[in-house]
């Protein structure tokens, strides 16, 4: 995903044993944004009876730092996940690795989730 020229948001569907059931493409955006609504992100989880989800999207710029929009989306996803009783395990932003960055940002690792 880090080499793609447009933002793409995907959701990994996880079963009760924390095994990956499938990966669904939810949104394709422009060069600098991917518009996604929680209902579109959780629709595949409901359809396939997923226990949990991992949300992943890329930043074509290569900078994996989350934007304000990314933070806002993560908060809304956490609220929706709680309401739907589907675990949101992580929201990961993919960029390009560098000397100062591993090339990704994990909201879970950062303590946001």
Would you name each region that the model predicts?
Residues 1-21:
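Long amphipathic N-terminal alpha/beta scaffold segment
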Residues 13, 17, 27-113:
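Active-site-proximal loop/helix of nucleotide/amide-processing enzymes and allied scaffolds
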């Amino acid at each position: 995903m880090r080499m793609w020229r447009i933002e793409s948001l995907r959701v990994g569907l996880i079963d009760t044993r924390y095994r990956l059931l499938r990966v669904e493409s939810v949104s394709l955006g422009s060069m600098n944004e991917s518009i996604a609504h929680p209902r579109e992100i959780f629709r595949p989880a409901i359809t396939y009876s997923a226990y949990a989800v991992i949300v992943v999207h890329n930043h074509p710029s290569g900078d994996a730092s989350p934007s304000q929009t990314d933070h806002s989306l993560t908060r809304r996803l956490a609220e929706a996940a709680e309401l739907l009783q589907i675990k949101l395990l992580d929201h990961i932003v993919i960029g390009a690795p560098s000397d100062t960055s591993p090339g990704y940002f994990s909201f879970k690792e950062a303590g946001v989730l």
